[in-house]
């Protein structure tokens, strides 16, 4: 099968989990024997060899589009540059800049497909998230491609109709303001999202496409998130933890780590900080250590640093981006990873942690509750703990319970987590299901079936 993938992020260009997902899907499909081609904006990165160039009319200007081609782990990647496509601000500059980039990406994708169509006529077009709506619409319009649209996280924004007019998609603009996710889902032959629970939680949207909507769980690359690859693999886990804490100026203790974006609307950092406040009055607090790692909302960053100043023996704030290799060392050393999200379409942190033996304590939402088996519900097969979202008291109570778990239970949680991540959530399984989606051979989400 010849498969064309559209994405605004593709490794090594990334902002969050989207790049990991799109790259893993493309490489996984290639590993299954399919011919996979990716179109992505350059975002100012000159990767690969010059392939072709052409001019595109957009926003009253003629833009010189340059295309570079590279092979990356069996996948052919075309980076489209020129004009705003070269802006290093992946989702910008600004809202207007992002929309202009998305429109230009759509038009440039048609130009590139014109160059390729003699040798590469995709059996399916797989577009990821709303930024690809113009490319999806135009490639369907001019080449009649069967298409799948995957929503990794609903954005719920509206786009002024003039951008669709600029993209030569007048037929898709019945209103002055357009929901690009609704439009992409409407024109696609199939719609997917990344977990069953998220699909049901957002049924007000996904239910509009009943009959062609389903879920495909994301996966995890356990060849990278692997305890055998960490530098301290020959040391007992307790010694790894002690060294990490010593490097941060902390005494040994049970470690609870948060790592992710400081996103006030989603990630629940404020819930964690309130839980730490509650724990500070509990006798268990003296033996608890909290690593809070991430960047984003300035107020949350300031609050996190204030907590470190207030509890210097217990809390460390790291408000910078860490390499994947450093994060892997942390997962292989800490005891627990805290994921207090308000919502989570799928989430990767819990599976990365499980691969490396860190036990997740997470909100019972979306993909988190689909991937984590809760200790209180199924002690024998449990892989972590689930708590209600936005409930600092429940989170604090779970962390106290976690701290007091005996070694046998902790080891069972770790081994169960490693097994579940590797066997049930591989990218190979995800890609096999995507192939069934492409061929229309997959179960559908239906309102009267649960």
Residue map of PLM features:
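Catalytic cores of nucleotide-sugar-dependent glycosyltransferases that transfer UDP/GDP/TDP-activated
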Residues: 1-450
């Amino acid at each position: 099968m010849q498969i064309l993938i559209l994405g605004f992020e593709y490794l090594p260009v990334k902002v969050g989990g989207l790049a990991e997902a799109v790259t893993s899907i493309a490489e996984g499909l290639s590993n299954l024997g399919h011919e996979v081609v990716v179109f992505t904006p350059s975002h100012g990165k000159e990767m690969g060899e010059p392939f072709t160039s052409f001019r595109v009319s957009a926003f009253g200007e003629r833009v010189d589009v340059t295309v570079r081609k590279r092979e990356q782990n069996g996948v052919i990647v075309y980076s489209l540059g020129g004009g705003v496509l070269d802006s290093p601000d992946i989702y910008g500059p600004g809202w207007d800049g992002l929309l202009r980039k998305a429109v230009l990406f759509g038009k440039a994708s048609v130009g590139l497909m014109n160059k390729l169509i003699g040798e590469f006529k995709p059996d399916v077009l797989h577009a990821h998230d709303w930024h690809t709506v113009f490319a999806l619409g135009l490639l369907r319009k001019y080449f009649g491609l069967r298409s799948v649209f995957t929503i990794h996280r609903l954005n719920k924004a509206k786009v002024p109709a003039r951008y669709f007019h600029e993209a030569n998609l007048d037929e898709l603009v019945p209103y002055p303001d357009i929901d690009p996710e609704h439009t992409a889902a409407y024109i696609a032959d199939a719609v997917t999202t990344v977990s069953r629970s998220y699909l049901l939680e957002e049924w007000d949207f996904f239910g509009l496409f009943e009959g062609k909507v389903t879920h495909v769980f994301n996966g995890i690359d356990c060849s990278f998130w692997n305890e055998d690859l960490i530098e301290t693999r020959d040391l007992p886990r307790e010694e790894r933890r002690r060294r990490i804490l010593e490097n941060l100026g902390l005494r040994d203790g049970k470690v609870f780590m948060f790592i992710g974006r400081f996103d006030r609307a989603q990630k629940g950092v404020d819930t964690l900080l309130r839980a730490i406040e509650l724990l500070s009055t509990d006798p268990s607090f003296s033996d608890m250590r909290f690593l809070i790692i991430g960047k984003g909302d300035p107020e949350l960053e300031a609050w996190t640093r204030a907590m470190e100043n207030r509890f210097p023996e217990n809390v460390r704030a790291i408000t910078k981006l860490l390499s994947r290799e450093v994060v892997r060392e942390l997962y292989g050393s800490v005891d627990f990873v805290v994921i207090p999200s308000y919502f989570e379409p799928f989430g990767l942190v819990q599976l990365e942690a499980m691969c490396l033996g860190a036990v997740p304590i997470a909100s019972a939402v979306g993909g988190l509750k689909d991937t984590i088996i809760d200790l209180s519900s199924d002690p024998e097969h449990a892989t972590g703990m689930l708590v209600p979202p936005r409930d600092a008291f429940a989170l604090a109570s779970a962390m106290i319970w976690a701290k007091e778990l005996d070694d046998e239970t902790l080891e069972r949680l770790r081994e169960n987590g490693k097994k579940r991540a590797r066997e049930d959530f591989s990218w190979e399984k995800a890609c096999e299901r995507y192939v069934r989606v492409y061929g229309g051979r997959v179960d559908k989400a239906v309102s009267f079936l649960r």
